[in-house]
Amino acid sequence: MIIKNLQEFYPLLIPNAPLIAIDYGSKKLGIALSNQERNIAMPLNTIIEINKKIVITSLLSIIEKYKVCGVVIGLPIDMSGAVTEQTNIVMKFAEELAKSINLPIYLQDERLTTKAANNFLKSFGVKRKDRNNNDDAVAASMILETVLDSMKKL
């Protein structure tokens, strides 16, 4: 079930179970995981794959392994808030994932997170190739951190 309102998403979550976040791109997906208390977001890994069936199978494995209770997907919208082609691609992916899992899926505005993640890694002297391999997972953790911080206020 896809949910666009955090106030509706939060009550559906099982206590003491982590969330997973996805930064969905055309060539790779960044994955982040919260701790069970849902107060820390950590980059987990990057899936470099364009076949959606393989991507969903990989995500199902991660969801099962970590006993995840909900999914956050970064929703790319342009700076004015308008829907873009990439927004529609991510929405379609979210719909496909929703058919495969019985967990709530929350769509979180992800404007500028990949750029911020890349700048963050650059500030630590991470080389360009390594930044490009890890920026999506770091972006996913930033998306998840935004959600975790917002949930604390509910």
Curated annotation (Swiss-Prot):
GO terms assigned for molecular function: nuclease activity
Compartments it resides in: Cytoplasm
UniProt-listed Pfam families: RuvX (PF03652)
EC numbers on record: 3.1.-.-
Principal location: cytoplasm
Keyword vocabulary terms for this entry: Cytoplasm, Hydrolase, Nuclease, Ribosome biogenesis
Gene Ontology CC: cytosol
InterPro entries xref list: RNaseH-like_sf, YqgF, YqgF/RNaseH-like_dom, YqgF/RNaseH-like_dom_sf
Top enzyme class: hydrolase
Domain of life: Bacteria
GO terms, biological process: rRNA 5'-end processing
Sequence similarity: Belongs to the YqgF nuclease family.
Matches recorded under HAMAP family: Nuclease_YqgF
Annotated function: Could be a nuclease involved in processing of the 5'-end of pre-16S rRNA.
NCBIfam families according to UniProt: RNAse_H_YqgF (TIGR00250)
Name of the protein in question: Putative pre-16S rRNA nuclease
Protein species of origin: Rickettsia felis (strain ATCC VR-1525 / URRWXCal2)
Organism placement in taxonomy: Bacteria, Pseudomonadati, Pseudomonadota, Alphaproteobacteria, Rickettsiales
